[in-house]
């Protein structure tokens, strides 16, 4: 996890045999709290990579194991079940796995594996009103992890989501006898947003992911999303008719 290595300049990875390996930071992504390190002398030890579980293979009730170094005690494995999938803890596009496997300081960034030893997620955080483990922990699922990690390894960062090149003109309109704020889409020239105007001459955004439209709301949704994620726009056309579209984002 990115929060684990923040502020650190030199990195050392310790194997379960107690061997220390120097490592370099390849890149990171703040949205997912993910960082990628690469050990510099991996060939000397013939290290094996963990097998990723198939995407969408984890179900509620499945047995899972969290591996980490809680409180610096050393390699520790705790067990639990998948309590829920697609949890939103601030960013709905991360769709975190919720488990009841014990997670404490030192577990962050550790593997969450299934009974076959396959990686299903990376432990990232807990929910607690006391600061201590309360039976609710979260992990970034392998579905998102593999996509984000691949981009970090290739580009040094994970690309941002985009709806294309366009501007928003803030206006107020009267709809259903109510005065509402609306973001009119103007100066559109490319990207997924352009497809909307194949059947419409003028469009105003009333809602973004079912929440009232504002420039800040649209910015935050795009900031949290990843390329390929869908954003739901509720639109009003020039005839006064409402439309709802799920638009798959592009990358920038």
Can you say where each PLM-predicted feature lies in the sequence?
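Serine-dependent protease modules
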Residues: 1-174, 216-219, 223-226, 238-239, ...
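Conserved PDZ fold ligand-binding element
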Residues: 1-2, 185, 193-217
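Short loop/turn microsegments at loop-to-beta-strand junctions
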Residues: 9, 107-110, 184-185, 192-194, ...
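A short glycine-leucine-enriched loop at secondary-structure breakpoints
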Residues: 54, 111, 176-179, 190-204, ...
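Generic structural signal for well-ordered beta-strand positions
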Residues: 120-121, 206, 243
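Edge beta-strands of extracellular beta-sandwich domains
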Residues: 244-248
């Amino acid at each position: 996890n990115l929060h684990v290595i923040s502020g650190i300049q030199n990195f050392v990875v310790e194997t379960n045999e107690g061997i220390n390996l120097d490592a370099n930071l390849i890149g990171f992504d703040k949205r997912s709290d993910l960082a990628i390190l690469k050990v510099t002398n991996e060939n000397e030890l013939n290290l094996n990579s963990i097998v990723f579980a198939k995407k969408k293979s984890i179900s509620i009730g499945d047995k899972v194991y969290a591996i980490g170094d809680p409180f610096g005690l050393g390699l520790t494995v705790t067990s639990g079940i998948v309590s829920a999938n697609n949890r939103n803890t601030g960013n709905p596009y991360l769709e975190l796995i919720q488990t009841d496997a014990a997670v404490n300081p030192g577990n962050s960034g550790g593997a969450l594996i299934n009974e076959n030893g396959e990686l299903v997620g990376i432990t990232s955080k807990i929910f607690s009103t006391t600061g201590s483990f309360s039976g609710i922990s979260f992990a970034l699922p392998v579905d998102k992890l593999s996509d984000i990690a691949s981009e970090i390894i290739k580009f040094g960062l994970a690309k941002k989501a985009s709806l294309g090149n366009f501007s928003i003109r803030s206006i107020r309109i009267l709809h259903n006898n109510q005065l509402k704020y609306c973001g009119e889409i103007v100066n559109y020239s490319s990207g997924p947003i352009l497809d909307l105007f194949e059947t419409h001459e003028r469009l105003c955004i009333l809602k973004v992911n079912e929440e009232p439209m504002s420039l800040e709301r649209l910015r935050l949704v795009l900031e949290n999303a990843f390329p390929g994620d869908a954003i739901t726009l509720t639109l009003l056309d020039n005839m006064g008719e409402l439309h709802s579209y799920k638009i798959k984002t592009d990358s920038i």
